[in-house]
Amino acid sequence: MINLRKTHPLMKIINHSFIDLPAPSNISAWWNFGSLLGACLIIQILTGFFLAMHYTSDTLTAFSSVAHICRDVNYGWLIRNLHANGASMFFMCLFLHVGRGIYYGSYLYKETWNIGVILLLTVMATAFVGYVLPWGQMSFWGATVITNLLSAIPYIGTTLAEWIWGGFAVDKATLTRFFAFHFILPFIITALALVHLSFLHETGSNNPTGVNPDSDKIPFHPYYTIKDVLGVVLLLLTLLLLALFSPDSLGDPDNFSPANPLNTPPHIKPEWYFLFAYAILRSIPNKLGGVLALLASILILLIIPLLHTANQRSMTFRPVSQTLFWILVANLITLTWIGGQPVEQPYIIIGQLASMSYFLLILVLMPLAGMFENYMLKPKW
């Protein structure tokens, strides 16, 4: 009898994607983050679905409904903590996944990479609108500050901002539509993730050496399924430790106070995973310039394939590029720290220097390093 998983129309797709998929034999734990992101997405959709059953998207009751979930709903506190900290785990995996792509030259699969950048932007949008929903002080003021950036767009800016708000300020209409966006976007992310995977399966996975692995492939199951299961177990363990022992450590204390349009918090700042971009936004003393720099800090990922100058794909055997890569990582950590600090010296100048070096590293130094390494590899005799 012919194996059903190889003949059934639906099972065949699953078989080619997760069972008989030929995978390079040498991919390391850095290749686990794709499956971890899938696990994060499933956790977020499930916990979000249960939260949506009890949440009300009205300015008068939103804050109370979140308190009601935590106090009165069976395991509501756990569902809420898993959802809030699940977002942090999601972004941690995303940043590591993107970092892996840059280090090992995975961006040369241009279609997969571009869909990945669109996915990153969509997840960031989802997280932003979701952060507004509890209607705490930082939710409200974060929404006010970030949506206000639209008004920097010449000519249509103010109209656009008021269109997004559904009025003349962040209010009931804004909260209702943000809830609608937050509900629909994860399903769009799921669809994009499937497109991302289908493009990846057109070429096959990259590997740490950056060399074509076609001559040495192994089946995905059982070798990488068991490896992914281990990754998911470690992810769940970390998430549970965070959600059970320190659920509020990554949040903002201002969000324990209901939104008050008449009282501005002393330091308005987003969640930790947006701080690097927020620092770049604040480092430019001009509103439109700041907005453009904020957009450029993410959209720069789209041109990374065009900036690849090295003859080798991966950074595994490129020490100069490796050094610059880790300087870039340190730079992003510095930006994250600066984003959480008040706007005063010395933080202003550190933020400006870090923002400048971020763009300098990606646009100038890393392409030059690739060219230098090509030159060093040429025989000199």
UniProtKB/Swiss-Prot annotation:
Residue stretches spanning the membrane: 33-53, 77-98, 113-133, 178-198, 226-246, 288-308, 320-340, 347-367
Q: How does it sit in the membrane?
A: Multi-pass membrane protein
Residues binding a ubiquinone: H201
Read off the lineage from the record: Eukaryota, Metazoa, Chordata, Craniata, Vertebrata
* Swiss-Prot/TrEMBL keywords: Electron transport, Heme, Iron, Membrane, Metal-binding, Mitochondrion, Mitochondrion inner membrane, Respiratory chain, Transmembrane, Transmembrane helix, Transport, Ubiquinone
Q: Where does heme b b562 bind?
A: H83, H182
User: According to the record, how does the cofactor bind?
Assistant: Binds 2 heme b groups non-covalently.
Biological process according to GO: mitochondrial electron transport, ubiquinol to cytochrome c
Q: Which organism is it from?
A: Murexia longicaudata (Short-furred dasyure)
By its UniProt entry, which CDD domains does this protein fall under? cytochrome_b_C, Cytochrome_b_N
Q: Where does heme b b566 bind?
A: H97, H196
Name of this protein: Cytochrome b
Relay the record's extra comment. Heme 1 (or BL or b562) is low-potential and absorbs at about 562 nm, and heme 2 (or BH or b566) is high-potential and absorbs at about 566 nm.
